[in-house]
Amino acid sequence: MSDSPVTLPESIKLTEYSHGAGCGCKISPKVLSTILASQLPVFTDPNLLVGNQSRDDAAVYKLNDDIGIISTTDFFMPIVDDPFTFGRIAATNAISDIYAMGGTPIMAIAILGWPINKLPAEVAQQVVDGGRQACMEAGIMLAGGHSIDAPEPIFGLAVTGQIALTDLKQNDTAKAGDRLYLTKPIGIGILTTAQKQKKLQDEDSHIAVNAMCQLNTIGTTIAKISGVNALTDVTGFGLAGHLLEMCQGTKLTAKLKFDAVPLLPRALDYLALGCVPGGTHRNYDSYGEHLPELSEHQKAILCDPQTSGGLLVAVSAEAEAELIALLDAHHIAPICIGSLETPTTEANVVLY
């Protein structure tokens, strides 16, 4: 099957129809906190194992003593011009939340907003087909969905998954001494901004796309390692933002080896050209007070919003070799980017 079954007129470029792109469209963490601060009485359900208290990747509901159901949704505006590829990336990103909990996806439904007076329905059909392709790669059906007439194109999924409760991983359960590993390089926001600014060279157009279309299926297997204490995916809040969620949920400090953070090819070249997404600045404004003093270069990398980014893994020293062997077997460079320690400073993240 071709990744682009219908040829688009040269005049149609999806990124020109939206003010934001991918997970860079996310509302900043600080504003989101205001939105989620409900004034209603607290309602609890003992079977809801994971809700929004820890800003985890998905909700988990206990069906019985052995099995839980995972529920998540994610959608955004175009991050690439090709509609099929946009749909595939958006779906891959949404499904990732299931893997980030250690689960297995079982079905998805589509969420589509479309400016029907600006873009042909045939273009939307290609977007949905891209979503179907990602679902097929994940082994699930795109079982339905909902659409509205919207001023800008939006696409994503609501995904349902299941998990053996013994394998459930959360973002706030790390332990002091855990090593930190990242399964995909950073730099997607930089490269996609280069495209939006029309600075991206044709020979580099595949770099971010290939990374964003890579499913995080390895999360299901990582979760079976008993020494993996916490797991999350790195998306719109950037590496620093999602690492902070892990630290604040466990009251630990992350010692981050900045020079060890893996970067996508050419990311530094485009960063030098000023390709910094607006989401980077929003991220830093939201949580910069919890970080050490950073250079502009460090901010641009650590706060770079990722779309369909990799998994951030916190693993005990005793299980580190098992994780490394698994990453090697899946052709993922096993690079330790730091560790989690008992706090010795007010900052949640320190660099060395």
Swiss-Prot record:
ATP-binding found in the keyword field: yes
Cofactors: Mg(2+)
Reaction(s) catalysed by this chain's protein: hydrogenselenide + ATP + H2O = selenophosphate + AMP + phosphate + 2 H(+)
Any GO BP annotation: selenocysteine biosynthetic process
Gene Ontology terms for molecular function: ATP binding; magnesium ion binding; selenide, water dikinase activity
Superkingdom, natural source: Bacteria
Kinase listed as a keyword: yes
Active site (record annotation): C23
The protein's role, per its UniProt record: Synthesizes selenophosphate from selenide and ATP.
Protein name (record): Selenide, water dikinase
Species whose genome carries this gene: Shewanella baltica (strain OS223)
